[in-house]
Amino acid sequence: MTGVQTCALPISVIALLAIAPLYGFAQEKVVPIKYGDMDQWIIRKVHESGVIGGNTKLLYEIGPTKEIDGNKPYKNMGGSPWGTSNVMAKVVGIVKTNNSVYRDKRDNGYCARLETHIESVKVLGMVNITVLAAGSIYLGDMLEPITGTKNAEKNMNWGVPFTQRPKAVRYDYKVKMSGEKDRIRLTGFSKKGQVAGQDCAITVFFLQKRMEDAEGNITAKRVGTMVMKYDKDSDGWVNGATYEVLYGDITKHPSYNHETMGLRERDYTRNSKGESVLIKEIGWAEANENPTHMILQFSSSHGGAFIGSPGNTLWVDNVKLVY
């Protein structure tokens, strides 16, 4: 393969989105993201190693209703485009889980509860790791098992193929803040540190036009952007919250925030060779360009891996795109 080509993966837009759109106002078309109603969940029963207690933990994944018993690496099922921060790790032969996304009851169905907490595993003479883990759901998948906290983000496949141009993202949410004025950093390899500034729950939506070169490196131009931070408790559920997607170069837009909306070089994807590579955003696309991929993440904390405030909680339900 020579030159530069647009990335292509065998997932169609039709498989990603629910087939029948919902119609709202006269000039508005609303399309649910597949499994975005959060009413179907896969429950994994993972048995942790005896040396750390031998407990059976339940890990929740978004997909067709099913139970899986056993320490099997998870792969997205039933055409689900959703990954979660719930993972099975195997470090120096010890099986340990992290569970920071939960299935919560809501009315006659379910929603997703994302929670920031501290996870630790300690075995004398073998392993001593304590990390801060945010609750996160996202479009993409995770390669299991995780074998350590160093470069664990390489296990994540960030985003899904997508070629449309929605005008907004819509979902229901509820927020509960930790009440802490600053965040903490716990990476598993160093002492607990303090990070200035209040923790926030966050929604990130990016549309990218990706290219892959002959060596498998992936670059991207940013086509569309929507980022929303939540720094206060909500008054119960906020239904049908709708946020506009901004197209093209948005650096002069009044709502632009470089920290959260700027071009990035920290997300990973799998190239056509199946290798995990960094996505390097190299510029802003023209405002009328079509994307090749969509990134959507909901997280109970912001600021990067292993940073946040324990207790921060974000509930999410009924995720849709508006055209």
Indicate residue ranges for each PLM-predicted region.
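Short, solvent-exposed secondary-structure capping/transition elements
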Residues: 178-185, 213-215
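Extended, low-complexity, turn-rich repeat/linker tracts enriched in Gly/Pro/Ser/Thr and Asp/Glu
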Residues: 175-182, 193-198, 305
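Aromatic (Trp/Tyr/Phe) and Gly/Pro-enriched flexible surface segments
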Residues: 27-164, 196-248, 259-322
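Sec-dependent N-terminal signal peptides
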Residues: 10-16
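Short, small-residue-biased leader/transition segments that mark boundaries at the very start
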Residues: 2-9
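Hydrophobic h-region of N-terminal signal peptides that target proteins for export
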Residues: 16-25
